[in-house]
Amino acid sequence: MDFITINSSNKTEEFALKQVAKQATSSLMYRLGKTIILASVCVEREPVSEDFLPLVVQFLEKSYAAGKIPGGFVKREGRAQDFEILTSRLIDRTLRPLFPKDYRYPTQITLMVLSHDIENDLQVSALNAASAALFLAHIAPIKSVSACRIARIDNEFIINPNTSLLNQSSLDLFVSGTKESLNMIEMRSLGQKLNALEEPLMLEALELAQKSLKETCTLYEEVFTPHQNELLFKESQAIVLNERLLDLLTNQYFDEIIKGIESSALSERENVFNEIAKKISEAHSEFSLEEIEWSLEKVKKTEIRRMIIQDKIRPDKRALEEVRPILIESDLLPMAHSSILFTRGQTQSLVVGVLGTDNDAQTHESLEHKTPIKERFMFHYNFPPFCVGEASSIGAASRRELGHGNLAKRALETSIKNKEQVIRLVSEILESNGSSSMASVCAGSLALYASGVEIYDLVAGVAMGMVSEGQDHAILSDISGLEDAEGDMDFKIAGNLEGITAMQMDTKMSGIKLEILYQALLQAKEAREHILKIMHEAKEKIVINFSHLPTTEIFNVAPDKIVEIIGQGGRVIKEIVEKFEVKIDLNKPSGEVKIMGNKERVLKTKEFILNYLHSLDQELEQYAIDEVLEAQVKRIVDFGAFLSLPKGGEGLLRKQNMDRCQVVLKEGDSIKCRVISFNKGKIALDLA
């Protein structure tokens, strides 16, 4: 067993090698403060034949890590929580570009959180633990990678803030990469205001992150290299393409390949290439269908990249900086609180907005919070198969859908003025040809406005791409699905005219240089300004139907009156809700009553509640202490009997008073009682 301590970027990390899980290809125990993560890498020895990287990353939180027992009926960890899925994606997107393109061995990376002290960053810790375990496994020539988080407090950037500092920050920037370049970025603005960050400041933050990553990665390589396993897989698994077949495709079928490239829809493009493959297979039996399909993909990709780099033209004939045509429609769904249909080229997002009460907020359990937290702004993204012409059923939300919804939420969250308002936006992707998450951001921002939600500003999103060949590269604005598939970078950027509120960068290369990222940021700003201009024009045409929107009325009563509004077993409040068709939130300690619904019904509900409480007070005023009266048994309970009083209202005769007099009562009996006290609006009785 070996112990390694590394000090870098405001943190002291400890690694225990060969201590646990020794049957894995590699494993380690990572420690930062009182946060402990078990990282393991397992690799199959037989490669798969399919053309993809068979990598699976799983990040798992254990409730005991924070001294908790899982909430809910089943006291065992079950389905992965959103944070676990998003963190798994974060690590996967960082590590995937590091693998050789011909690597085909099934690989599983597992991160288990065994202890967490709340203050240390779980995502940075998990990624660094995964990176170290992968580097030690030495399954292929893979560079060391690390992560850091940048916060901004009082105009000062802070590297790797703890949770307390991050809660004070206006910026949450997560960056991972090697010592030479960046290969994954997640960013969002934080705080009560919009806090969009300008491009020059974003570059400054990224430069700081790059410096931190270089320091950490250099230390990792120096310290971990002596402990690496022997290189596991040296031979190449790359498919060798037939040169004669490539010549045949280039000379005889090139025009048909160009036709397929220029097809806008994925289904249409696939049909064209399937027909080409079928035609060649029938005419040239010496080539297998698999060989033909591989070669077709190679020729297609080479030509697309050549067009972009050399001809400065894209498959759909757009210029490199050109955004596809945009059409915005509003108020399509009469029963929703808002609905916006945003169409950009062949990508179409229908975002529907609904406002709710505090009871509608999503509750989450988290290791990073001592008590369950309420998510008041929800953004759910759905990608049904028909949006790309696929004939398959719709199932549960995928990792990708959760990730895209989270990105859109992060882009819009700080634009909302009232952070206590409960809002749910749902993006239904009806057509997709790239940049659907950014279309969701645009439609979502307008849907907030159309719902009557007060916002600081509209937010627009655009996906940027890049194609790189040697020393040459081209930045693309508003990438299509084909450009995303054949390009080297997917850089989603959202914000307003002043700056950026969220961004996400992934790459298929081992990393992207800062100067290229900054060029993409500036080009994205131009595209964003163009989109925002169209969105502002659409905003002016939106007519907010305030009569249809729910309104909220908040008032206070004496805290001891809340139980009267609830009633026995919730009977009174259920009747009120059913009668007036509203939602009611009650706060017992403060006496606050919050009613939400149609404006007219809300006002009638408030009037009813106040009149109801007043009538109860009047009933009490009719009786005096020591007054003797004839009452009727209304219902028997474990602790006594509730009696109907002759002048209205009811009183409680407690069981001990009945037992003292050896009286046995049944419902409907009449009995003489004496008023002995008034307590919190209740009349206490004794036998006369």
From Swiss-Prot:
All copies of domain S1 motif, residue ranges: 626-688
Keywords of this entry: Cytoplasm, Magnesium, Metal-binding, Nucleotidyltransferase, RNA-binding, Transferase
GO biological process: mRNA catabolic process; RNA processing
EC category: transferase
Keyword hit for Manganese: no
InterPro entries linked: ExoRNase_PH_dom1, ExoRNase_PH_dom2, ExoRNase_PH_dom2_sf, KH_dom, KH_dom_type_1, KH_dom_type_1_sf, NA-bd_OB-fold, PNPase
Catalytic activity: RNA(n+1) + phosphate = RNA(n) + a ribonucleoside 5'-diphosphate
Compartment annotation: Cytoplasm
Known role: Involved in mRNA degradation. Catalyzes the phosphorolysis of single-stranded polyribonucleotides processively in the 3'- to 5'-direction.
HAMAP family from the UniProt entry: PNPase
Family: Belongs to the polyribonucleotide nucleotidyltransferase family.
Protein name, per record: Polyribonucleotide nucleotidyltransferase
